[in-house]
């Protein structure tokens, strides 16, 4: 896909801790049917070969629904499975390095908790930003919460899309009203849902 056409409205981040491989793939498919616009495969505890194997399986599903697949952390896995892009966090390789390795046509996303980090990521070639955690999250044991006012400041500081992440669901997303973000990233709201397709809608 053309990275200029990136749609981050509803951004699903996977979490294998809730699933067997079979149920994770089923959940991703149901979420794609429900309307997620981007899927990020996150496998913190898998080695390269296992990660790549799962990436190919997830990409087969996302391709079927024309949903771009983003690989968390691993540029090598993203390139090997020809994913749409990669997402790098603050402790991963620098955005500028990810951009150089991925080339000009792939998507590079970055995590930003401050305006300074957001501006730096943008200048280094990021296509979008993940900002948060807005609320406490079950995916990270220790997390520093990001104020909605900071999210708003980031949205005003850079011209690329910003996605709010962290403990968000249909019941609490009203706090984001007026922040100016382009989309919302969810993990447990879909990955733990009895009906992922319905929750994605």
What are these regions (language model features)?
Residues 1-93, 100-127, 146, 153, ...:
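Conserved N-terminal beta1-alpha1 strand-loop-helix module at the mouth
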Residues 41, 78, 135-141:
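A short acidic, helix-capping loop that chelates divalent metal ions and anchors anionic groups
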Residues 93-94, 137:
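A short, polar/charged loop-to-alpha-helix boundary motif
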Residues 131, 163-168, 184-188:
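Glycine-rich beta-strand-to-loop/alpha-helix junction loops that act as flexible
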Residues 132, 157:
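Mid-sequence acidic-hydrophobic segments that form the walls
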Residues 179-183:
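Internal alpha/beta core interface subdomains
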